Amino acid sequence: MPSNSETKGRISADKGSKIKRSNSHAEDSIRVQPHSIEAEEGLLAACLIDGGQEVITACIESHITAECFFKRQHQVIFESILALYEQGSPVDEIVLHDHLCKSGTEDESGGIATIYHIQGRIETPAHANYYAKIVHEKYLLRRLIRTSREATEACYEQQEDISVFIDKIEEEIHNIS
């Protein structure tokens, strides 16, 4: 049988670990999710250079969607870039701004000042593939975080057969890539 001092030590250790977990959870809830504003702006800028057709095509082929962007303004801008591309319209800062105004999303995008800021980020689309890779990787990390949190919550509420439950979670994680 453990002595009273051993028991106190274990309780203290347990309390300490609970506090650590609690602090870790609190820290996790206030942490900023993975993203790279610089890569997002670089990729958007590359889409605006020389009509952006090659870069936009590469984005589509790489499964870059508006959801891949962390910043809401960037999502709105990329949605408009894709819409212009699908219409066969040229993509530059003036046509993009006009599209944002006509679609009622100018304010949400940050307007012409944001477009000019983004446009000034790079001078050549030469590194667009690298920017796209960074944007996509950060998006996948955010999806993994979200899926992991949802899986953790589901573990507390798990009611079904454990092997079926684990299979579902494995499938959700596998679907991220």
Residue ranges and their predicted role:
Residues P2-Y139:
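Noncatalytic partner-interaction/assembly domains of nucleic-acid and motor enzyme complexes
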Residues G120-S177:
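Interdomain "pre-motor" coupling segment immediately N-terminal to P-loop NTPase/helicase cores
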